A protein has these predicted regions:
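Acidic/aromatic/glycine-rich contiguous surface patches that form carbohydrate-binding/processing clefts
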Residues: 275-312
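A cross-domain feature marking catalytic cores of carbohydrate-active enzymes
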Residues: 6-8, 34, 65-69, 109-111, ...
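Conserved, mostly hydrophobic/aromatic
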Residues: 30, 107, 164, 206, ...
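Glycan-binding loop/region signatures in secreted carbohydrate-active enzymes
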Residues: 210-281, 311
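Glycan-recognition patch characteristic of GH18 chitinases/ENGases
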Residues: 1-92
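Short, acidic/polar
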Residues: 9-24, 81-99, 146-154, 270-284
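Short acidic, glycine/proline-enriched helix-loop-strand junctions
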Residues: 58-61, 116-118, 122, 127-129, ...
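Substrate-binding surface in catalytic domains of secreted glycosidases
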Residues: 39-40, 91, 114-241
């Protein structure tokens, strides 16, 4: 399996299938970010479009609608803890999937806590049962397993849903205490190893980044750096504009570059075809179900040639 997340933010953009789909021959599932929880009573907003689905199916791609919990004020303990609101959400999601002829639903709830984890798992159980009755696939996005997020209970998730997706990125993120790689080779290897230790490998999907971060170091001692996310081509354009050449870094399995501008030091660990290939090579050794990529539009046409070697 090879999934590409398509970030959709407006009704207008939801009507257009990803423009680079012709180059993405290896991709067999596209997941538009169509659904978002809108309150604590089981309602959600929808950007779903039947024309989009028809285009995707015509191109040989299955469509999994993504639902997130990113809106400010959403309290999963209320949404999922109440049988009434939980059932309303499940019926609504499956209803939309049927209405728009979707092939699956991708759950991207990133604000699960220890207090609502049990309700979250019950939501996944009930959703999967109803989804399977209607021949829909359920996948769930997860952080790299660690002690501080053990309550996500990936072992139980693996017994319930069809695919458990490891988001093998954000090793360093906006707000990190120090600059660093978004997804180093060792980070990916360790994350996948942790995941397959708890979830059957045939249900594990490794998600890798098409984006990187340009870090601006703080001038003050002990100050936190700031960063901006860029796609592959944009990152290389920045380096060229500063007459800077990236050099291979064996430690991260990536090309690294740094330069000074306006008295500030900038650092970047590139995500491009070579580093992506090395990560995919390591993941493939674990014989997992497939790969996913965040996000479509940050890659280059040539990137799919690398992906094609592992997604056949």
């Amino acid at each position: 399996m090879c999934l590409g997340w398509h970030q959709v933010t407006t009704e207008q953009s939801s009507k257009a299938i990803y423009s680079g789909i012709s180059s993405a021959g290896a991709m067999n599932v596209i997941a538009p970010t169509w659904f978002s929880l809108s309150d604590n009573e089981g309602n959600f907003t929808s950007l779903a479009d039947s024309g989009y689905v028809a285009q995707a199916h015509g191109a040989g791609k299955k469509v999994w609608g993504l639902v997130d919990d990113f809106k400010k004020g959403i309290k999963l303990s209320q949404v999922l803890g109440s049988t009434t609101s939980r059932t309303k959400l499940i019926n609504g999601l499956v209803g939309k999937a049927i209405q728009y002829d979707l092939d699956g639903i991708n759950i991207d709830f990133e604000h699960v806590t220890k207090d609502n984890a049990a309700a979250y798992l019950e939501f996944l159980r009930e959703l999967t049962i109803k989804a399977h009755i209607n021949e829909l696939v359920i996948s769930v996005d997860n952080y790299t397993p660690a002690a501080h997020n053990a309550f996500y209970n990936i072992k139980e998730q693996g017994k319930v849903v069809d695919y458990v997706i490891l988001m093998a990125y954000d090793e360093h993120y906006q707000g990190s205490e120090e600059s660093g790689s978004v997804s180093s080779l060792e980070f990916v290897k360790n994350g996948v190893a942790s995941m397959v230790a708890s979830v059957p490998k045939e249900r594990v999907v490794a998600a890798l980044p098409f984006y990187t971060r340009l870090w601006k170091e703080s001038k003050s001692k002990g100050g936190k750096p700031t960063s901006q996310a860029y796609g592959m081509s944009a990152a290389e354009t920045i380096l060229k504009s500063h007459d800077t050449t990236a050099k291979w870094d064996d430690t991260t399995g990536q090309y690294f570059a740094q330069y000074k501008d306006g008295g500030y030091t900038y650092k970047i660990w590139l995500e491009e075809e070579t580093s992506l290939g090395k990560k995919m090579d390591e993941v493939a050794k674990q014989k997992v179900a497939g790969f996913a990529f965040w996000k479509l539009g940050c890659e280059r046409p040539a990137t799919w040639s690398t992906i094609q070697k592992y997604c056949k």
